[in-house]
């Protein structure tokens, strides 16, 4: 039956055209009439009807106009966002193109072995996709903002047809299943027939139990493209490169990595005079990529604090605009921390050749060499107090990280590697001259909460009780095992297809299981962040992930895979496990499991060299409807499309003045937390006026249960610094890479006192994000409407960001 043609009724709504409808382009659609919160509730159905009248063939980005308007009433954002998401993705679920039909119609785009797999199992694939789509549409379909970010980051066109989310997941599942079935050691460990394997992968991806990086979802299974990659992070150690060498590397690796949306990390300290020019080149390339593509990229610059150029970089950091996607990361040696608290101490800064020699030293000889050069060579000096004050000022800006070099060396599984880089996006990995990367995957721990357990399971090993819920460790171990196999399948795929970043992963085959949803688990079961059970749960999660990763990696070698190239140089070859670096480590898993694992590692080796990370994957976690690993809120939504209309709200309902520009400027997007919104829906206006501070609320307005819940949210997540450190410390023995350390503090907390605590506790990456209470609320009056997109907002705005 022929589908009825749908057209836009431009006069719908208030029976008049708004400003944007006078433009020739039909890709714009305005809902600014519904900007006021009081009208929004009454008009939600009208909005749905208007969206229903959109021609499904139109550019779906027009729905962003609607979101810009409805975000003015942030207390109903989750509901409206999901409603718009349904319409936004309406054509994605068996509407215009069945995913398998679209895949099979593109033999010039999809790899032949993937096409053959889809052909062979086509009927079964259709039944699985139909079954999983029901659950996806009812529970896991993302809102319009998350969905738009998902699709714009991937932005594949299959012979002129935009790839839908189900089509992306089908391509991923088919490719991964085909790889596992073809590679012997993976097939033997997985021990599932292709039907079970495909179905399990489909349910995991559709329900966001775990998530692959956007670059992997973009390129996996497609016919080889020039300069494409499945890895989302790349570290470049350019210390030995000349300016000419850098130009070559930039053309062959750096710029292509940016075009793939990868997070780039570089040590630019030692260029000195050329550094500023190189930095400007990289910033201009970031602007080009973000202007001409839909990719979101990030640059991390490493700065060695013993180099004389460090002061220049800190000054440059302060001058960067707040909207810049650049993070600085200071590499700090042990001798710096030894002088940290000494009164009147001075710090020496060396010029290029001397600083380069120091950088080549391992941490054992670094201090000796530093003192020798301090006595015998010309150098600059700065008082420690002035230097630290400058560092803390940058840290308060929220885009500065620290790496404690001594802790990296002390706790690394690969000893005596002279050059290290790491940071907030990629974790601490050994880097030789050149490139290094990692296969990261996001694990959403919310999925392991259950309401009941089997009598056959053992408490404390297979599950733990959390208030009225159970956290299922047996299921977590099963899922993590499959994730390690999938990660190895992707790495093998990259090597096989000559991924242009594969040279950075071949030696260590590093993978990172990144935890997210932890805070959502705490809030769901009613645990406060400072509760001992919360810290214990996090430690157990890290322990089970690390054990399962190493166990699976060893099993790969037992089934015929070769140990990674770095195995013989690692401490694994000596029979060590990562937590052996720490004293008095509490392990929940039985000792016999660890003993057997050690023996097997010595006998067979490990396929991978790094496994677990506390770092959340910033871009990917936004689609999973959960919290970051330690940060309780959804991240700032980024709207960058050039055809977005910025609505300037003014007093009065009928004023729908709109301003267009080629680039989106000065658009404030609020951050909201679903759990807080749902539990305190009727109290939002009141809570906003008291700044969400528990001690300031009128207890007569709340029930006892609501007061208990409010205590869990802890003054709008303003946790005590000691609680944060104790939480982070609990997982350290099982995190062999970096950890996402988010510190939200008030003015009474000194960052100067925080750094020694982190250093002595054994943190390798000291900072990930620092949010200062006064900085976050400096320009916001919580008792008045917030200046977000217009003048109206009465939602939970914990943090806002000015976005280009």
From Swiss-Prot:
One cellular component (GO) term of this entry: virion component
Protein name: Ribonucleoside-diphosphate reductase large subunit-like protein
Species the sequence originates in: Human herpesvirus 6A (strain Uganda-1102)
Gene3D superfamilies: 3.20.70.20
Keywords recorded for this protein, A-Z: Host cytoplasm, Late protein, Virion
Main location: virion
Protein family according to the UniProt entry: Belongs to the ribonucleoside diphosphate reductase large chain family.
GO BP, sorted A to Z: deoxyribonucleotide biosynthetic process
Described function: Does not possess a ribonucleotide reductase activity. Betaherpesviruses probably use another strategy to expand the dNTP pool in a quiescent host cell.
UniProt subcellular location: Virion; Host cytoplasm
Domain of life per record: Viruses
UniProt keyword Chloroplast, yes or no: no
SUPFAM superfamilies found in the cross-reference section: PFL-like glycyl radical enzymes
Keyword Transmembrane listed: no
Classification via InterPro entries: HSV_RIR1_betahv, NrdE_NrdA_C, RNR_lg_C, Rrm1
A GO molecular-function descriptor: ATP binding
One Pfam family per UniProt: Ribonuc_red_lgC
